[in-house]
């Protein structure tokens, strides 16, 4: 179920402050965040965020198409090891 419109998008307070500080500084550095639940806002376009996936921070460069999505959508948490090899085919 979608979030009701009267509430507006959810963004952690510290995240908004970090983005504003990074926008003001001249050097471009990765902003480390743990808030995968936060919505990407238009103010974040052009910034690089390090989104935590449980082990490490995955760098995510925010583009216009990402606005309205959540940060967690762009940082996968599970690694797919592949399907098990067929033992019969391996012996041949």
Swiss-Prot record:
Disulphide-bonded residues: none
InterPro entries linked: Ribosomal_uS19, Ribosomal_uS19_bac-type, Ribosomal_uS19_CS, Ribosomal_uS19_SF
GO molecular function, one term: structural constituent of ribosome
Signal peptide span: none
Keyword set includes Ribosomal protein: yes
Keywords (A to Z) from UniProt: Ribonucleoprotein, Ribosomal protein, RNA-binding, rRNA-binding
Sections of the chain in a coiled coil: none
GO cellular component term of the entry, any: cytoplasm
Keyword Ribosomal protein annotated: yes
Family statement drawn from the similarity comment of this UniProt entry: Belongs to the universal ribosomal protein uS19 family.
Record's function text: Protein S19 forms a complex with S13 that binds strongly to the 16S ribosomal RNA.
Protein name: Small ribosomal subunit protein uS19
């Amino acid at each position: 179920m979608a979030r009701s419109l009267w509430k507006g998008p959810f963004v952690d307070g510290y995240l908004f402050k970090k983005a504003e500080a990074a926008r003001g500084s001249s050097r471009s550095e990765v902003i480390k965040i743990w808030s995968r639940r936060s919505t990407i806002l238009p103010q974040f376009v052009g910034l690089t965020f390090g989104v935590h996936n449980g082990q490490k921070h995955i760098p995510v460069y925010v583009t216009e198409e990402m606005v309205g999505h959540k940060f967690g959508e762009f940082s996968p948490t599970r690694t797919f090891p592949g399907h098990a090899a067929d033992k019969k085919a391996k012996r041949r």
